[in-house]
């Protein structure tokens, strides 16, 4: 665990809550103007502890904290009695035989008989707003302030705001504590004003929510608080219940009263009182462990009220200093695991983040290394804030939403987005924070996914498709081009395999990882078909749709590459996973030998997206579709780059490059999205093409990042979609290292390449604590040209070679 530095001891030891000046490393988001409450998602700084999220915005003396809870959703069995997770009431697997025959005879077909029901899918939604206002300032119309400064410390997870008004200096701080499972707000001033605290949601009607206030006077040790309780619908059935309490920390010396008509808690500081702190807790009656047939797939748990009451009481009984100390120690133990240090040639460290983003120009080949470093650190910060043991994994908006209906439901899209959210965790010391992902798949996907496999495909094992909520929606939705995506679980098994490779956690593998992997392999063993179109004897997927692109057909490269990886993973870990079924292993081995590996070169030298002949007209030049589905085995996967030897094979490299050039820069009319650009950046990095990798990284920053560093889907226009925030970290790591697994038959010493695509603009940088497959870490640094010159291998026991991009041996075990 990293010790508290002098730059953080101010919070714990000094009487002020002011932050120290930022260090040279890129660890702060900085603003000199308030976050705009009319444009929250592009200006507010986010806080989170995995389960809870805050978005802080509002003018001085009118601060607002928008509150999210990971499990607060509309839809599912909470809102309709016959919700089926998109599954049919009876098997439709009989339609597959005729559909497959048609596809093999004609090249394309349809999956109409498998399409499902989208109704009552639901959406992630905001809980409400906590507002902290100063009535005397509002009555006088005085909300302007001098010297305004807000700063989000990415190392400690603390947001501080400072300003002066009417002769008083005011400091506020906010953080979301994982150890205490609350978010905390504090205000300090030598002339502390009276406050009004409200908790509510103006988007929700009064019939669905109840706001109460308790002044804490004369009722034992119960502290003053405001409370918001609600349901997503009255019913029947009754919708999801939610409960939130904002409670004054007991050490605050104040007088309190309630304005019951508005549910407002009025706080008047006592003589000599210079600070007031408030803890906020929230929960729902969602229970992930009740998503099985035994519980009718209900996911309905106990009323959240008692737990929220107990949790906020316990937190409010502590001092602000103790709350802050435990939070910072916890946060630093995670952010201190890994560091990337890039130069700051433009002296950007003291420039507001919005200005850095506004002036950033992708055409400037030097970019701004400080901002690029900052956004990398932000990726890790956002993951720590949105993914903690006991929470759900980050969704399309991470943990931060401001409405009742999020874009794309704020769900789990699993044809690039959910995967991209987890690109950096294994390598940056955050691999243990992926437990929400494993539990979500085990609790939410597997139980009903087994039903989907049986009803749609007549198959063993389990399967899900492209879009999943938190209510076990594992069936197809209603549009084949995006819903016919049975490869989602196969792709997620790459993350299962990677977690094993980096963590070497055999207990987890046997208990959770391998059973999921085996179930996916069993499904695909039952579904592969002998290719009757090409008549080459290979095994292919039929039917398939390349994600969101092209026809329903057979042998989609994306599917074939992912099934290839699933089978390789099974054979690599079956012993460690405790496999006892020799027949299963034999079937995987024989199917892998016959499997079409998803690599074919087309008429114009490209890797083909479909096995169909190019004469069908689907794989054409300058098709700038947002997805790079046929390159999944290049990056982030490795069936092409490693198992087929692509990283050192010019034929594969040329076909990948040809497709990347044709697919464009990620700015097509269908989606000018940041995630499309950073995926391209990572693919170019794996080709050792520094110029293109850095350009796509710069282009994403220039085009898709808002003032608060959040990535937007269409240029800088909403909606907010967090995947590029996480994906930018993956792109940077791809420029720093090539650490590929080997096929299960390969017993040679593995080689890791450091600095495959480090731009000269990053010259003189270094990395500390980069995790490696098979265990251990590496620290390294590079010269002004971007060539790694020094590396130190730590905690590594098995054989490994570390080289730079020129092949120079840097370290060896």
Set out the residue ranges of the language-model regions.
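Well-ordered alpha-helical segments within folded domains of soluble proteins
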Residues: 415-426, 485-497, 559-568, 627-638, ...
